[in-house]
Design a protein with these regions (language model features):
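Class I S-adenosyl-L-methionine
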Residues: 1-116
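Anionic-ligand binding region
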Residues: 119-124
């Protein structure tokens, strides 16, 4: 069982990485911040995921309850964040809790809004 912190990119569902999209599609449990991550990014999981949970209105303790339940059942978790989860993300506090409990995790980078905006400007 692994928790995958997946960067969803700058908001355009077509800008998520191939690896991020594959992990979302294949993870039985998906936790995403609905206030920041467009629901369309999770469309690839429809019909595959057992649970898709919007974490925008719940706190870290509640998020951890969902992760711990998945861990107890041996199910991978896609924890989807906006942009790149390591840049202005809130994964540090989650990672500390996972490490305390011996739960494996992996960080999957996403396209940051900074990188995307440079491309959208069309300038060098």
């Amino acid at each position: 069982m692994t928790v995958y912190f997946i960067g969803a990119g700058p908001g355009d569902p077509e800008l998520i990485t191939v690896k991020g999209q594959r992990l979302i599609k294949n993870s039985p449990v998906i936790l995403y911040a609905g206030s920041l991550v467009p629901r369309e990014i999770l469309d690839v999981a429809e019909g595959h995921a057992e649970k898709i949970i919007d974490t925008a209105s719940i706190d870290l303790d509640e998020i951890m309850v969902h992760i711990e339940a998945a861990h107890a059942e041996g199910k991978d978790v896609a924890r989807v964040h906006s942009g790149d989860p390591s840049v202005y993300g809130a994964i540090g506090e989650q990672i500390r809790r996972l490490e305390q409990q011996g739960i494996d995790y992996e960080v999957i980078p996403g396209v940051t809004a900074t990188s995307a905006s440079a491309a959208w400007l069309g300038k060098e």
